[in-house]
Amino acid sequence: MKPEPQSEAELMERAHDIAGLSFAELADEAGMTVPENLKRDKGWVGQLLEWHLGAPAGSKPQQDFSKLGIELKSIPIGYNGRPLETTFVCVAPLTGVQGLTWETSHVRNKLSRVLWVPVEGEREIPLAERRVGTPLIWSPDKEEEQILRNDWEELMEMIVFGKFDQISARHGEALHLRPKAANAKALTEAYSSNGKPMKTLPRGFYLRTQFTEQILLKHYINVQSE
């Protein structure tokens, strides 16, 4: 793995250096094997980018570049330039949630400064031939942060009151909550609506594609107008 970048400028320079390169080229330099597909290797693209950008944190609660306060997110893009899937932010806490605030939440910490790296994501393009796009660095503006905060507070309130069965895909404008488990047997501790301990599927916070699409649009419109 490349050494950890010491500044945001150095990180961005590295991200720009790999823009336009294929996964095969990047994997070759990193000594990694390109899998046939991502069904069993969902985190492979992220690991490849982490190697080239020098991200030391892995999937711990802190940001990928904790010294710089920056989170790395790859974002698969379709032919139309739109995100193809939601973006995982972090695992949702289901116990010990009393007194949690937006200001100290993992979601806010992870999304305070994000390096977005678009990658070709159309399934008909062989994985080895997919290329990395132009990176962008982003922090939520006041409006975006308010939307995220409102969503987080609404969803966390439902968790506090044990309303897991009532949380659906329609809750949350930018952020939504859904089960995150490789199989249905991977249960975790939680509390039911009557306060009794129970087992349920782990949940994860995800950004909706409409929200990430707006981030990309705003950025590239601003770049073109400069």
Swiss-Prot record:
The gene is mutH. Its main location: cytoplasm. InterPro entries: DNA_mismatch_repair_MutH (IPR004230), DNA_rep_MutH/RE_typeII_Sau3AI (IPR011337), DNA_rep_MutH/T2_RE_sf (IPR037057), Restrct_endonuc-II-like (IPR011335). It comes from Vibrio parahaemolyticus serotype O3:K6 (strain RIMD 2210633). SMART domains: MutH. GO terms for molecular function: DNA binding; endonuclease activity. GO terms for cellular component: cytoplasm. It comes from the Bacteria. It is found in: Cytoplasm. Belongs to the MutH family. Keywords: Cytoplasm, DNA damage, DNA repair, Endonuclease, Hydrolase, Nuclease. GO terms for biological process: DNA modification; mismatch repair. Sequence-specific endonuclease that cleaves unmethylated GATC sequences. It is involved in DNA mismatch repair. This is DNA mismatch repair protein MutH.
